[in-house]
Each structure stands twice: as structure tokens, then as C-alpha cells.
């Protein structure tokens, strides 16, 4: 799934507050720049003078901070188990290099609690292959024992179609199942090194998911030993409750409750050029994909 799509409006508002009120330099992946906040996007904040830089990795952000010690640099850390280790590494390097002008604003999430929240409303989980490459498949196998079926899929068209075909055949057998259809990347044990790094530096926290609400224990934040690099603590960010456009059905799309074209703003007010919701921003988003390739035209 796309981490941008489940990132709540309030996170964008926090980043804008840091940029406009504290004058920090925001380093972010490009997809986040156009995601609407309550009043504006990061692109809109940039037009008001905010310093917004697009980077391709947290290492790029840490490197920028090292070259610009006069600036306070905050990296917008979003993603699942796949990206959290790289963000932890950037903090570890910053601490080693004595870079106290670098920190993370974290909206990282973990999948187990999301599976728990959704398992009653799904026939089959199409597990994200790159997440399972880190976490392994133990949880998927455990969920099968609870009656929850699923397959791990890769990301090419052939891999996705293979996983879907396997899922349909197994589903018709009428018994809970789990099949790893991405064995060239996903191993049962996952990546022990990545798991250990994440466990060393982070702890679980409650986290808000766009469309799903607050899911206890589904977020990731830095442990106390690394709290100097936690932007929320460093800048004492006030509680910000973001408000999404009520016409946007991004949350329902994420849960499979409706097609993107069922949303009344889809393809009209909401387009890739002028997105109303996060699902239209990223090329990994369901609405953007449906706009480009669906039967809506």
C-alpha cells in the first residue's frame, strides 16, 4: 500500500506549522508535497515562504542537514516496516556526527494492528510483499489459524495476477489459507537485521490512519535515548486535529468499500493535477491508478 494514502491530514498540518511557525526546513518525499492539509498543502505553504525540499531518502535529508548547520532540518518520516530502518539509520548517523539540527516528524506505521482492525471486513488479505520482506510471514501464518486468509504478492503485473489467481482458487476451497507468492524476496524469517535496528531505536505508539481512524499501537516513535531527534518533542508541536474535505471518500476507497469513481468529486474536482485526497496524489494511490487506467473515462 501507499504510505502517503494512509497519512492523516493532521500530519500535513504539523509539517506546515513547523515550516511556517518555526522556520524549519522540511525535507520530504515528493508525493507528500501536494497532499492537502486542512487549509493548504506543503506546496501551498512553500508559496507562503516555507522552506520545502524534495529528497529521495532520509539519508539525503541527513546529508543536507550536515551541509547546512545554520538550518533546522526536519524529515517527514512516513512509511511502513519497509522504510523505518532507513529512517532510523539516518538518526543514528546524525547522532554519531553530532548533527543536532536534524530530526524526524514521524508518521510511520506497522501492519499487524491494521490487519486486526480490518480482518472482520475482508475475505482475503493481499499482503504487501516489501513489508513482508522485512517482517517475515509468521504473522500471516498466525492469522490463518484465526481464520483469516491471505497471499503475499509481488509488484509486477505478473506477480500480482499470479497472487490473485492463487487467492481465488484457494478461496473456493472454503478453508483458511496462506500462500507466499513472492518467495524470491519474502522469506519466513524476514530481515533480522532490519528488525533489530527498528526494535533498538523505536517503540510502538498509537497512530491515526486516514480512513481508519486511531489504531492503538500501530505507530512508531523514537525511544527516549533518541528523543532529541523527535521533532514533536524538540519543537513542542501543539495538538493539531486535521480536517479532511468531507466530500472526499479516500477512506472508503482504502478499505475497499467503494470504487474511486463512486466518489462524487472523483475526476471532476479531484484530479491528479488538483487532488482533493491523498489517494489521488501518489501514483501508488488507488484513485490516481483508477483515473489513469480505470473504466471511468
What do the PLM-derived regions correspond to, one by one?
Residues 103, 120-186:
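A conserved active-site cap/scaffold subdomain adjacent to cofactor or substrate pockets
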Residues 27-30, 75-78, 105-107, 126-128, ...:
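Short beta-strand segments
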Residues 69-74, 144-147, 244:
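Glycine/charged-rich beta-loop-alpha catalytic/anionic-binding loops adjacent to active sites
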Residues 161-252:
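Internal helical hairpin/lid segments
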Residues 2-7, 31-35, 76-86, 111, ...:
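Gly/Ser/Thr-rich loops at beta-strand to alpha-helix junctions
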Residues 1-12, 29-32, 52-58, 108-112, ...:
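Conserved mixed alpha/beta catalytic, RNA-binding, or beta-rich assembly cores of soluble enzyme
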Residues 87-89, 138-139:
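Short amphipathic alpha-helical segments
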Residues 1-70, 84, 92-97, 103-105, ...:
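Metallocofactor- and cofactor-centric catalytic cores in central/energy metabolism, strongly enriched
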